Amino acid sequence: MIDLSVYLVLDPDLCGGAQGMIDTTRAAVQSGVRCVQLRAPHWKKRALVECGRALKSVLSGTNAALIINDHADVCLAVNADGLHIGQDDLSPADARAIIGNDRVLGLSVSDEQELAGVDSSLIDHLGVGPIYQTSTKTDAGPELGIEGFARLAARKPCPVVAIGSVKPPIVGELMHAGADGVAVVSAICGQKNPAAAAKALVEEVARARS
C-alpha cells in the first residue's frame, strides 16, 4: 500500500534539471514524503530512464514509492512502483496489462463524467483536479475549487489525491473534503528549502487527520 498523504510530482524546470529533481526528492523524503512521481513530458525516454533509476536509488530503503508519469515502458525499465496516466494516454486496461498487477496505477480525473468511467478493478488511486489553475500543467481542465473537489470525492471509487496549486493553507480543507492525500509540484519543487516545504505539507495532513 502506497502512502499518498503528500504526493510529490517532480518538475524538471522548477527543480533545475535531473540533479535538482534528485536533490529535491532526497529532501522531501527526509521530511516525510512517501510518494514521488517523475514527470518530464518533454524529455527523451533515455533521460527519463536514467533519472528514474537515480531516483529509485535515492528512495531505496525509505518506504517511499516511485511513480512514472505516462510511460509504461519507462516504469518497467526502472522497476518503478507504479504508473500514472491521464485521460488521453494509454487506456487503464492497456496500462494494467503492461505493468501487471504488482504495481499501482493512478489516473487523472477532472470532472464527473471522467469519474463515472473509472474502473476501480484497474485503477488504484485518482488524481483529482485542478483544484486551482496551475502553471505547471497548462492543459489542465477548469478549476474545481474545494467545493467541486468535495463533490467528486464524495463519489470516489478508490483513494483520491487533490492536485492543482495545492499549498499548505488549503490542505486541511481538502482533507476534510474527502482527500486521501495532496499532490504538489511548486509547493516543493523550486522552493528555497524543499525539506521545510515538504515538512509543512506533511504536518498539515497530519493535523487534518488528528
Q: Predicted regions: what is each one?
A:
Residues 12-13, 132-134:
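A short, flexible beta-alpha/helix-coil linker loop
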Residues 1-90, 97-124, 141-147, 151-160, ...:
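Conserved N-terminal beta1-alpha1 strand-loop-helix module at the mouth
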